[in-house]
């Protein structure tokens, strides 16, 4: 299965690209969004793409374009680096595609897929950090349960965590399909519309890569370094990250209605004036896109414009 960029046309429209602007694609992946952004940039425009997967970075290095640079690392660290590199000149647009790529899922040795057997690794950057199988081995039942509940919103987190912990005491779980079988046996009722391992794999991956902290940090950085009337565009794939982005936009978003309870106090006026962004809208994939690319079915595109 080849990687198809999700909501490509909608993303490019949302960025509202200025020909001579400076843009950041925080998640290069297979380069689909990056290549499309380059089509809209003028000769003096700049595009910086970031990825913490060395294989993706090596793909990016094959793009020979003086307007383009590929950077290896986490977007929470590399976005501020790009800002400083450009002498603190404000950015014209930032894109974050928060999903894992089809290429990563298809690589058995990465451990992201619950449909293929491979080593339980799950690190986006597999040159550093602890692989998933080692974390599961060293963790207590309570630690595993907490992660499954917090990051996977798994209703059977207690049953699954006990099953994982007890199995690891006898024999170390190192393979993806071994973990899948343990999950299946632990769950009393299987949802016919969702694979039983979906939430557990999601939770472990989020924990191993510290994805939520990364996202929250990057949201705060982005609204500080974007130009006025320029946009932050984010593609979310699961309810947890979608909720974080939605609430962040809501917290920092401009209030366009008059609050109840007149007269308005000075404190309320300051709160309204201090809003940093205008929430544009959210976009979901059309039925035609979902039919062509099933991966897109859970995607939500959220757009915020700086004030």
UniProtKB/Swiss-Prot annotation:
Pfam families: Methyltransf_5 (PF01795). It comes from the Bacteria. Its EC number is 2.1.1.199. It catalyses: cytidine(1402) in 16S rRNA + S-adenosyl-L-methionine = N(4)-methylcytidine(1402) in 16S rRNA + S-adenosyl-L-homocysteine + H(+). S-adenosyl-L-methionine binds at residues 31-33, 51, 83, 97, 104. It is found in: Cytoplasm. SUPFAM superfamilies: Putative methyltransferase TM0872, insert domain (SSF81799), S-adenosyl-L-methionine-dependent methyltransferases (SSF53335). The keyword rRNA processing applies. Gene3D superfamilies: Putative methyltransferase TM0872, insert domain (1.10.150.170), Vaccinia Virus protein VP39 (3.40.50.150). Keywords: Cytoplasm, Methyltransferase, rRNA processing, S-adenosyl-L-methionine, Transferase. GO terms for cellular component: cytoplasm. GO terms for molecular function: rRNA (cytosine-N4-)-methyltransferase activity. GO terms for biological process: rRNA base methylation. InterPro entries: RsmH, SAM-dep_MeTrfase_MraW_recog, SAM-dependent_MTases_sf. The keyword Iron-sulfur does not apply. Specifically methylates the N4 position of cytidine in position 1402 (C1402) of 16S rRNA. NCBIfam families: 16S rRNA (cytosine(1402)-N(4))-methyltransferase RsmH (TIGR00006). Belongs to the methyltransferase superfamily. RsmH family. This is Ribosomal RNA small subunit methyltransferase H. It comes from Buchnera aphidicola subsp. Cinara cedri (strain Cc).
């Amino acid at each position: 299965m080849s990687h198809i960029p999700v909501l490509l046309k909608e993303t490019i429209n949302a960025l509202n690209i200025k020909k001579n602007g400076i843009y950041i694609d925080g998640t290069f992946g297979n380069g689909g969004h990056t290549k499309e952004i380059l089509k809209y940039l003028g000769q003096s425009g700049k595009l910086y793409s970031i990825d913490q997967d060395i294989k993706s970075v090596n793909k990016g290095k094959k793009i020979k374009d003086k307007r383009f640079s590929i950077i290896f690392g986490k977007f929470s660290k590399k976005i501020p680096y790009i800002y400083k590199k450009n002498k603190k000149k404000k950015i014209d647009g930032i894109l974050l595609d928060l999903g894992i790529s089809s290429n990563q899922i298809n690589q058995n040795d990465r451990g992201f897929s619950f449909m293929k057997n491979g080593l339980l690794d799950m690190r986006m950057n597999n040159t550093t950090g602890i692989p998933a199988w080692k974390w599961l081995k060293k963790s207590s039942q309570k630690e595993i349960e907490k992660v499954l509940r917090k990051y996977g919103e798994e209703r059977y987190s207690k049953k699954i965590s006990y099953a994982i912990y007890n199995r690891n005491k006898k024999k170390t779980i190192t393979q993806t399909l071994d973990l899948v079988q343990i999950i299946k046996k632990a769950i009393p009722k299987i949802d016919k519309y969702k694979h039983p391992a979906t939430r557990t794999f999601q939770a472990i991956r989020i924990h191993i890569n510290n994805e939520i902290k990364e996202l929250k940090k990057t949201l705060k950085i982005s609204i500080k370094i974007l130009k006025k009337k320029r946009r932050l565009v984010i593609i979310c794939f699961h309810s947890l990250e979608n909720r974080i982005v939605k609430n962040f936009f809501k917290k920092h978003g401009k209030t366009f209605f008059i609050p109840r309870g007149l007269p308005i106090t000075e404190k309320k006026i300051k709160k309204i004036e201090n809003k940093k962004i205008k929430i544009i809208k959210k976009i979901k994939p059309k039925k035609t896109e979902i039919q062509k690319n099933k991966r897109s079915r859970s995607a939500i595109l959220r757009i915020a414009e700086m004030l």
